[in-house]
Amino acid sequence: MSAFTPASEVLLRHSDDFEQSRILFAGDLQDDLPARLDTAASRAHTQQFHHWQVLSRQMGDNARFSLVATADDVADCDTLIYYWPKNKPEAQFQLMNLLSLLPVGTDIFVVGENRSGVRSAEQMLADYAPLNKVDSARRCGLYFGRLEKQPVFDANKFWGEYSVDGLTVKTLPGVFSRDGLDVGSQLLLSTLTPHTKGKVLDVGCGAGVLSVAFARHSPKIRLTLCDVSAPAVEASRATLAANSVEGEVFASNVFSEVKGRFDMIISNPPFHDGMQTSLDAAQTLIRGAVRHLNSGGELRIVANAFLPYPDVLDETFGFHEVIAQTGRFKVYRAIMTRQAKKG
């Protein structure tokens, strides 16, 4: 990361104001400004493992990754700079968590793109840290206030759940398909064969719905699930437990923390990172799959039909099949053969 996001560029217009501040950066941290801004001290807290990877290389233990921030994560900070995400419930979870830990009198800055809905920060924080807009540039807004009252934060109150064909799906703010099973995942599930056996890796597992639905019809599969999102990791663990399904769940930037090989890799890969369109994760998934598939193993992914994945699949595996499609989505299948590049 070297290029700054528009939100960071707005903050840099005020860089002189931050030189004496002990800052906690949090929210949608899509660049390394927290590591590079000239401050008295800087910490960062993120729920996104790939953002933590970048920041921790420069900030060490002052960059933290977890679902819920703790008092240690905000220690000695007198200023919060919060990058507004595109998901309002996610912002609510994170801000209530952070403001419950920071001392009264803390300076609060909220910055974000106008299209992300950053304006709603004013209403959200009205009872705790009344905000005023202090800058507007790069289609972003920057808001400032001072913490007057700490909210009471209870992470358990943010859990949600829904049912899919008799399965219980547990969700948290910021998890993909929080309110119900998305159409793409439904299409992918329709292609899975009952009584499948072997080791299955679910990359970008979200709330864990693909894995538990697969396990119900194929109870002998051995499941591993991973996601970059701390809320997704916790939601998947809860979904597995709620349906009495066993599996290993951990945070990983695609394959960064994955060990070993699998008989099948399934995924509904993201193509948005925050407000930005990004095909990086899916391309990393396709290219890296050959290092994590057994001979004869398969990669099966669902994607928006317009996305340019066939070329990457052919380049990596030598061929691919479309095994299901609608007007909007396609399910791609690629098999690990001698033709496949061995990574």
From Swiss-Prot:
Q: Which domain of life is it from?
A: Bacteria
One Pfam family, short name: MTS_N
Predominant location category: cytoplasm
Q: What Gene Ontology terms describe where this protein resides (cellular component)?
A: cytoplasm
Task: Give the subcellular location.
Answer: Cytoplasm
Question: Sorted alphabetically, which InterPro entries does this protein's record hold?
Answer: DNA_methylase_N6_adenine_CS, Mtase_sm_N, rRNA_ssu_MeTfrase_C, RsmC/RlmG, SAM-dependent_MTases_sf, Small_mtfrase_dom
- Catalytic activity line of the entry: guanosine(1207) in 16S rRNA + S-adenosyl-L-methionine = N(2)-methylguanosine(1207) in 16S rRNA + S-adenosyl-L-homocysteine + H(+)
The molecular function GO annotations come to:
16S rRNA (guanine(1207)-N(2))-methyltransferase activity; nucleic acid binding
Keyword rRNA-binding present in the record's keywords: the answer is no
Swiss-Prot/TrEMBL keywords: Cytoplasm, Methyltransferase, rRNA processing, S-adenosyl-L-methionine, Transferase
Its Enzyme Commission number(s) read 2.1.1.172
rRNA processing: is it a keyword of this entry?
yes
What does the annotation say about its assembly with partners? Monomer.
Report the protein's function.
Specifically methylates the guanine in position 1207 of 16S rRNA in the 30S particle.
Q: Which family does it belong to?
A: Belongs to the methyltransferase superfamily. RsmC family.
Q: What is this protein called?
A: Ribosomal RNA small subunit methyltransferase C
Q: Which organism is it from?
A: Escherichia coli O6:H1 (strain CFT073 / ATCC 700928 / UPEC)
* Gene behind the chain: rsmC
